[in-house]
Amino acid sequence: MGYTEDIILIQRGRRENMSDKPRRWKAVGVLDIGSNYVRMGIYQAGKGGAQRLELLEHPLRIGHEVFTSGRISVETVRRLSEILRGYSQVMKEYGVTEYRAIATTALREARNRAYVVDQLKTQNNLVVE
């Protein structure tokens, strides 16, 4: 069983054939790489504001590693990449063309943060802020 199968679905909207339907709004994604969870929200953005369509989260204890060893292990980078690959698929299903991927304290304070960010760009084509 892959890690993406363990994703916790918090709120699910309708996403069947979302990228094929004409619409007056656009779907945007927000990814949050936190200390204990990796989350992704899909939002419907239009002139009237934004509405959340879906929110996913997956537990991943990046903070524990960073705060005990100062680094993120290769195995955790692999798991993070797999989670983000699953999230990328969901964004594709919604027709998301714009996203922000934000790393919180754990990743920012890791001694190997440049390596991790580079791996995520290489493996997932995601730019992490």
Language model regions located:
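Primarily the dimerization/phosphotransfer
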Residues: 36
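Nucleotide/phosphate-binding catalytic cleft detector across ATP-hydrolyzing
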Residues: 2-33, 41-129
